[in-house]
């Protein structure tokens, strides 16, 4: 695979573990070869629209001036990043985006900066958020949910093989492409670690008990969140959602795994969710040396063509309607906000290596 593509043809006759080993070596080379972004602002791109606004930045639709390609540009204010203590996270996000190459993960195309802002140039995935589609249809049937869950499981397997903990799995961080396949985005909380860490981060509803209790944790927190995601796909709600958004009450429920299993879940889905959402990490599905294989071989995934999914040969149950690169119908309407322009370089020492 080249630096600026995520295309990879997976041969079903090859041992997938060998393929992952090769991808790990390629990841390591990119991880160890990081470059600083030039101070070119967005001068090589034409801004066409705003795709979204987040707590740490704005995502814009841009078109390159030298060609016809469209991209998503994530613009982040240096001042906001410093104020919100996100400096390490943004460096980390760029690092991961630059090194990771997998069909279901967003990757870095380009990066740039100016006196006030940092920019990550990413592939345009204009089918919208899986969150928005899921909210519209309310629930997925199990076959539909399995299609997305299989891709997420493969993406987590890849990240864990690269010694990455994702730590922010939720429908809002999953995008749909024009063929109906997923792209996981937002790697601000992703951390490269061989063993355990203890940082409190993530989204409350998806936090594993050990994170809530401020105990050291490992990559199995991603499999806990995966269990919540699959539950939410089919139930139409998070297992620990609280109507009045009482986070303390939610945390107490998470710590004792207090939730209701819908009666319409099949026995296989019930088993998968129960196996993933285990408070005792030694019993949690995915938390072994062969963790991802244990998840993929669970009866709920029986019949999944894993190589067919990897090569995107399986027809998606839903394909977003997209008329062209500037079709923003799958996104909410956002307005441009004026960008301030300083005459001095903001925090050059903090962002020198970005």
From Swiss-Prot:
Q: Which GO terms describe its molecular function?
A: ATP binding; cAMP-dependent protein kinase activity; protein kinase A regulatory subunit binding; protein serine kinase activity; protein serine/threonine kinase activity
Q: Which reaction does it catalyse?
A: L-seryl-[protein] + ATP = O-phospho-L-seryl-[protein] + ADP + H(+); L-threonyl-[protein] + ATP = O-phospho-L-threonyl-[protein] + ADP + H(+)
Top-level taxon of origin: Eukaryota
Annotated keywords: ATP-binding, Kinase, Nucleotide-binding, Serine/threonine-protein kinase, Transferase
Q: Which Pfam families match?
A: Pkinase
Would the keyword ATP-binding turn up in this protein's UniProt record?
Answer: yes
Which PANTHER family does the record match to this protein? CYCLIC NUCLEOTIDE-DEPENDENT PROTEIN KINASE, UT01108P-RELATED
What protein name is recorded for this chain? cAMP-dependent protein kinase catalytic subunit 2
